Swiss-Prot record:
It comes from the Archaea. It comes from Methanosarcina acetivorans (strain ATCC 35395 / DSM 2834 / JCM 12185 / C2A). This is UPF0251 protein MA_0157. Residues 91-124 are annotated as: Disordered. The lineage of its organism: Archaea, Methanobacteriati, Methanobacteriota, Stenosarchaea group, Methanomicrobia. Belongs to the UPF0251 family. SUPFAM superfamilies: Sigma3 and sigma4 domains of RNA polymerase sigma factors. Pfam families: DUF134 (PF02001). Residues 99-115 have a biased composition (Gly residues).
Length: 164
């Protein structure tokens, strides 16, 4: 069996979980949707790309894209029909550039670190730890999970930060 090819994800998704309305105790289960599965749905339904075009963007074969889309839709449908929460994390993907900017202007630093469940395979989305650093003046601030460092402005000089 050959190794699984990591998929290109152009967009850092800020939502990490969706839950049915109601008390937490009433939600029996959750479904895990990976980052690359969410990207497959985004490219297909929000960017209206054909499966061939979307597969090229993710640098995978069209048949792989089709299987990932089917799997993602099955998971979301299961969650909606059975009232399950959807947790979004992990997957086998990489961001296209290692400076925190990706083609969509977002993304974690360290494109290769995003394999599996993030930094060290135990974290989420490239790891919740770490710092955002200003490339212009060197100022550092702790990374806030769920917020791309490229969206944070340096307190000293106003430049966009990058993930360290």
């Amino acid at each position: 069996m050959r190794p699984r090819k990591r998929r290109i994800v152009d967009f850092e998704h800020s939502a990490r979980q969706f839950r049915p309305f109601g008390p937490e105790s009433e939600i029996p289960e959750e479904v895990l949707l990976t980052i690359d599965e969410l990207e497959v749905m985004r490219l297909s339904f929000l960017e209206n790309l054909s499966q061939g075009e979307a597969a090229l963007r993710m640098e995978i074969h069209q048949s792989t894209f089709q299987r990932a889309l089917k799997k993602a839709l099955e998971k979301v449908t299961d969650a909606l029909v059975h009232g399950k929460a959807i947790r979004i994390e992990g997957g086998d993907y990489r961001m296209p550039r290692g400076d925190g900017t990706g083609p969509a202007g977002q993304g974690p630093v360290g494109g290769g670190r995003s394999r599996g469940q993030g930094k060290g395979r135990g974290g989420r989305f490239g790891g919740p730890d770490g710092n955002c650093v200003c490339p212009a003046c060197g100022y550092e601030t702790p990374h806030t999970p769920g917020v791309s460092c490229s969206q944070v402005k340096c307190e000293k000089c106003g430049s966009s930060m990058v993930r360290k």
